[in-house]
């Protein structure tokens, strides 16, 4: 029991394997697992679109259900005449986060040794979640400005100029809430699984892992839905 407690206390958080590139420090383990997630998505896309049939069957049929689900995320949050152009972006967010989260929950990355730290889900790193949130932030500003031009900024003084500071603060808190919600949930899930594995090494905590997979899926859905919602708000007409 004492040795288990010592192992739990020795779990490293925030230890990174840095790559030096043009004087910049890059988190190597984050990029490696991100590439794995991207390769998996590309392979699935190739398999699903290879030798396509008019009447979809098997894996092609499954992918069409997935596409309809992803399309509905955008359709339910963005106006009918605008949502189609945002389906690729929202779908990419969801799929990357979903696959990254599941890779972190299912793959025993600790078995792969690297010089420093350990491999984990890309969403286990705050830099990844902040980058995804900033992409969303840039997207809803682009959506609003492309439709309304400089009139977009009138929303900050609507319905009264008194709300200007609050409305500006709201736009800054959106990416913060997106990034920290995703990061916090993924880190907490991985830590819980790690602690259970150390406390009960002979019995893999399957219920905890299943709960983690469910929570990971929900987090991907929440992130994509909120991103679509923010874009929809930017495109909506304010009276």
Swiss-Prot record:
One of its GO terms (cellular component) is proton-transporting ATP synthase complex. The keyword Oxidoreductase does not apply. CDD domains: ATP-synt_Fo_a_6. GO terms for molecular function: proton-transporting ATP synthase activity, rotational mechanism. Pfam families: ATP-synt_A. It is a multi-pass membrane protein. It is found in: Plastid, Chloroplast thylakoid membrane. F-type ATPases have 2 components, CF(1) - the catalytic core - and CF(0) - the membrane proton channel. CF(1) has five subunits: alpha(3), beta(3), gamma(1), delta(1), epsilon(1). CF(0) has four main subunits: a, b, b' and c. Belongs to the ATPase A chain family. NCBIfam families: ATP_synt_6_or_A. Key component of the proton channel; it plays a direct role in the translocation of protons across the membrane. This is ATP synthase subunit a, chloroplastic.
């Amino acid at each position: 029991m004492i040795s288990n407690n010592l192992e739990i206390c020795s779990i490293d958080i925030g230890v990174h394997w840095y790559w030096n590139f043009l004087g910049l420090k890059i988190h190597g383990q984050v990029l490696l697992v991100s590439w794995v997630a991207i390769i998996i998505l590309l392979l699935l896309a190739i398999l699903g679109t290879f030798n396509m049939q008019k009447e979809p069957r098997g894996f092609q049929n499954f992918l069409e259900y997935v596409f309809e689900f992803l399309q509905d995320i955008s359709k339910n949050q963005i106006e009918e005449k605008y949502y189609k152009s945002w389906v690729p972006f929202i779908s990419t967010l969801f799929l990357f986060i979903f696959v990254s989260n599941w890779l972190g929950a299912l793959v025993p990355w600790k078995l792969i040794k690297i010089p420093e730290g350990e491999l984990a889900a890309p969403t286990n790193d705050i830099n990844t979640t902040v980058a995804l949130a900033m992409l969303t932030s840039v997207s809803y500003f682009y959506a609003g400005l492309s439709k309304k031009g400089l009139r977009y900024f009138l929303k900050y003084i609507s319905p009264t100029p008194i709300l200007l500071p609050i409305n500006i603060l709201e736009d800054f808190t959106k990416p913060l809430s997106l990034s920290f919600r995703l990061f916090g949930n993924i880190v907490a899930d991985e830590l819980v699984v790690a602690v259970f594995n150390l406390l009960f090494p002979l019995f893999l905590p399957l219920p905890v892992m299943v709960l983690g997979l469910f929570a990971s899926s929900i987090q991907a859905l929440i992130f994509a839905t909120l991103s679509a919602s923010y874009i929809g708000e930017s495109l909506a007409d304010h009276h």
